[in-house]
Amino acid sequence: MGHSNVWNSHPKKYGPGSRLCRVCGNSHGLIRKYGLNCCRQCFRSNAKEIGFIKYR
């Protein structure tokens, strides 16, 4: 049983690595507010379809 078999073999149920973007699957820069669960890059590209308006 080598290192590559053991690394990330146990599922994560808590912490930042357990939550993924619902669009692309990325775990970095995640926006969880209002239950979006979307990374910031996907949020910027889909904000208008979701219903967010940029005022400035």
Curated annotation (Swiss-Prot):
<keyword id="KW-0479">Metal-binding</keyword>
<keyword id="KW-0687">Ribonucleoprotein</keyword>
<protein>
    <recommendedName>
        <fullName>Small ribosomal subunit protein uS14z/uS14y/uS14x</fullName>
    </recommendedName>
</protein>
<feature type="binding site">
    <location>
        <position position="21"/>
    </location>
    <ligand>
        <name>Zn(2+)</name>
    </ligand>
</feature>
<dbReference type="GO" id="GO:0022627">
    <property type="term" value="C:cytosolic small ribosomal subunit"/>
</dbReference>
<keyword id="KW-0862">Zinc</keyword>
<feature type="binding site">
    <location>
        <position position="39"/>
    </location>
    <ligand>
        <name>Zn(2+)</name>
    </ligand>
</feature>
<dbReference type="Pfam" id="PF00253">
    <property type="entry name" value="Ribosomal_S14"/>
</dbReference>
<dbReference type="GO" id="GO:0006412">
    <property type="term" value="P:translation"/>
</dbReference>
<dbReference type="InterPro" id="IPR043140">
    <property type="entry name" value="Ribosomal_uS14_sf"/>
</dbReference>
<feature type="binding site">
    <location>
        <position position="24"/>
    </location>
    <ligand>
        <name>Zn(2+)</name>
    </ligand>
</feature>
<dbReference type="GO" id="GO:0003735">
    <property type="term" value="F:structural constituent of ribosome"/>
</dbReference>
<feature type="binding site">
    <location>
        <position position="42"/>
    </location>
    <ligand>
        <name>Zn(2+)</name>
    </ligand>
</feature>
<keyword id="KW-0689">Ribosomal protein</keyword>
<dbReference type="GO" id="GO:0005829">
    <property type="term" value="C:cytosol"/>
</dbReference>
<dbReference type="GO" id="GO:0008270">
    <property type="term" value="F:zinc ion binding"/>
</dbReference>
<dbReference type="GO" id="GO:0005886">
    <property type="term" value="C:plasma membrane"/>
</dbReference>
<comment type="similarity">
    <text>Belongs to the universal ribosomal protein uS14 family.</text>
</comment>
<dbReference type="InterPro" id="IPR039744">
    <property type="entry name" value="RIbosomal_uS14_euk_arc"/>
</dbReference>
<dbReference type="InterPro" id="IPR001209">
    <property type="entry name" value="Ribosomal_uS14"/>
</dbReference>
